[in-house]
């Protein structure tokens, strides 16, 4: 139900009210709520009822009962009167705690982090890592070496197959000279393409002086007197 602010019922909220019912009972309690049917809610309510004596000689006595929170039906309500003003403390009753007296301490909110004046704890020697940005490995050390090595080896193999000159790092000697029958000395022409070079000592190198001409090799007997020895290397024997 819509109730205006100027309603008399709203003006008596939290007052101590005396409610009289049709059967003569009286309810005294703190008025808290109501509705359009005049159903009431009373808290801290006490019930008072009059008991008639059996004999006419005895006086009528009144009985009191403590009920607490009560819901009264509006159809049984006869009248409502103000019993007293609202109590001073309408909140929840507080129970005093032992030792709750104020002390010398100061209440403050719990802070986050470490205060500025407290020194930072340090790790034991040997367990502390390098400072960020200082003492770490260089970029060259962290670069993977596998790719560069494989690429260099592949380039060297390709250059050797194609016949391109291989570049050697500074401080190292070049390739060793060719052994055996290599290129002819300067000023002389080599054999034409497709022909094998002639047998015998390399061109430009005199024959060995260890064995004179006409002497048999070591381990062979010389020919008997009057017979010619074998022809020198590179010459055909005479026809008979």
From Swiss-Prot:
InterPro entries, per the entry: LSM_dom_sf, Sm, Sm_dom_euk/arc, snRNP-assoc_SmB/SmN
GO MF terms held by the record: RNA binding; snRNP binding
GO BP: any one term: spliceosomal snRNP assembly
Domain Sm: 4-86
Protein name: Small nuclear ribonucleoprotein-associated protein B'
Modified residues (Asymmetric dimethylarginine): 108, 112
Organism: Bos taurus (Bovine)
Family matches, as SUPFAM superfamilies: Sm-like ribonucleoproteins
């Amino acid at each position: 139900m819509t109730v205006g602010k100027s309603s008399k019922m709203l003006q008596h909220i939290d007052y101590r009210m005396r409610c009289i019912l049709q059967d003569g009972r009286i309810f005294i309690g703190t008025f808290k709520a109501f509705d359009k049917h005049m159903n009431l809610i009373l808290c801290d309510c006490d019930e008072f009822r009059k008991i008639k004596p059996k004999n006419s000689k005895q006086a009528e006595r009144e009985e009191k009962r403590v009920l607490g929170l009560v819901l009264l039906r509006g159809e049984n309500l006869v009248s409502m009167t103000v019993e007293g003003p609202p109590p001073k403390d309408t909140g929840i009753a507080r129970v005093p705690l032992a030792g709750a007296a104020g002390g010398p301490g100061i209440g403050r909110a719990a802070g986050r982090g470490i205060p500025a004046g407290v020194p930072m704890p340090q790790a034991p020697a040997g367990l502390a890592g390098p400072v960020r940005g200082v003492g770490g490995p260089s970029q060259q050390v962290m670069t993977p070496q596998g790719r560069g090595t494989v690429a260099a080896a592949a380039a060297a193999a390709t250059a050797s197959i194609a016949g391109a000159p291989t570049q050697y790092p500074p401080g190292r000697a070049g390739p060793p000279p060719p052994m055996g029958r290599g290129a002819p000395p300067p000023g002389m022409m080599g054999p034409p393409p497709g022909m094998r070079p002639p047998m015998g000592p390399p061109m430009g190198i005199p024959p060995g002086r260890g064995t004179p001409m006409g002497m048999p090799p070591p381990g062979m007997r010389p020919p008997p007197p009057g017979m010619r020895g074998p022809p020198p290397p590179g010459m055909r024997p005479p026809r008979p």
